[in-house]
């Protein structure tokens, strides 16, 4: 539409240009005719009044034609302007589309749950999954046990899983003989992998059995961690072997040897013995050693 308006504007501009050019040519022609008529009047014997009347009539007829042409061009221009005003934004107009209502299917799929989940259907009666209503399974049309077998017990009690699901897993407990529990980490890691595989193959267990098993494993893990920390990782020899503590021991030994006028080796043995006493398990209370270190202790007043 914009290109059509631009082309129509070019056509209108060309009309005005040609009309003005024709009018100028007509005026120039009239001037030439006037000069020619004056020249001919001076040399002809035609009556002057007749020539002038003819000239006036021709001039008036030319002006009338030009005025009519200009009025027609103005009228066509006003029509184009009114068309553009009535349709100000024609590019972005589009036919009105009918609103399409998205209707839901009347026969929506109903998600059925076992009768053991009846508390969900009771407490959350408006629960929907993917647009489908959640309802209890009818025991007549399915192979699940009757509702009376799920009368008591929590919702997620694993011992109440229906029998057909239990029969699908068949293993012999004798395949995994129980071994005495030992108290070191390597055996704990190995047995945990074996027990994990055995738990996956055995029958479903209840929450109580599962919680007891997890508590037992956590206690074993903490005991093993404490034993490793006390007897291996945090032993006095390993603590004293660290670079930071040994540097501090050397500084303390030098200070003690200077203050007490002792050899460096003896002062170091004293510091080691004191640290071993502090880190021994027999002492439950740490006392501050009575060491008076001062550089002015041997100075006489």
Swiss-Prot record:
A motif (pLxIS motif) lies at residues 290-294. The phosphorylated pLxIS motif constitutes an IRF5-binding motif, leading to recruitment of the transcription factor IRF5 to induce type-I interferons and other cytokines. Changing residue 294 to D: Phosphomimetic mutant; retains ability to activate IRF5. Keywords: Cytoplasm, Endosome, Immunity, Innate immunity, Lysosome, Membrane, Nucleus, Phosphoprotein. The modification Phosphoserine is found at residue 294. It comes from the Eukaryota. Induction: Escape from X chromosome inactivation results in an increased expression in females. In monocytes and B cells, induced by type I and type II interferons as well as LPS. Its main location: membrane. Changing residue 294 to A: Abolished ability to activate IRF5. It is found in: Lysosome membrane; Endosome membrane; Nucleus; Cytoplasm. Coiled coil: none annotated. GO terms for cellular component: cytosol; endolysosome membrane; intracellular membrane-bounded organelle; nucleoplasm. Highly expressed in immune cell types such as B-cells, neutrophils, dendritic cells and monocytes, the expression levels are two-three-fold higher in female cells compared to male cells (at protein level). Expressed at low levels in T-cells and NK cells. One of its GO terms (biological process) is innate immune response. Innate immune adapter that mediates the recruitment and activation of IRF5 downstream of endolysosomal toll-like receptors TLR7, TLR8 and TLR9. Following recruitment to endolysosome by SLC15A4 downstream of TLR7, TLR8 and TLR9, specifically recruits IRF5 transcription factor via its pLxIS motif, leading to IRF5 activation and subsequent expression of type I interferons. Plays a role in the regulation of endolysosomal pH in immune cells such as B-cells, dendritic cells and monocytes. The pLxIS motif constitutes an IRF5-binding motif: following phosphorylation, the phosphorylated pLxIS motif of TASL recruits IRF5. It is linked to Some alleles may be associated with systemic lupus erythematosus (SLE); a chronic, relapsing, inflammatory, and often febrile multisystemic disorder of connective tissue, characterized principally by involvement of the skin, joints, kidneys and serosal membranes. It is of unknown etiology, but is thought to represent a failure of the regulatory mechanisms of the autoimmune system. Because it evades X-chromosome inactivation, its expression is increased in female immune cells which may be involved to SLE striking sex imbalance towards females. Interacts (via pLxIS motif) with IRF5; leading to IRF5 activation. Interacts with SLC15A4; leading to its recruitment to endolysosome. This is TLR adapter interacting with SLC15A4 on the lysosome.
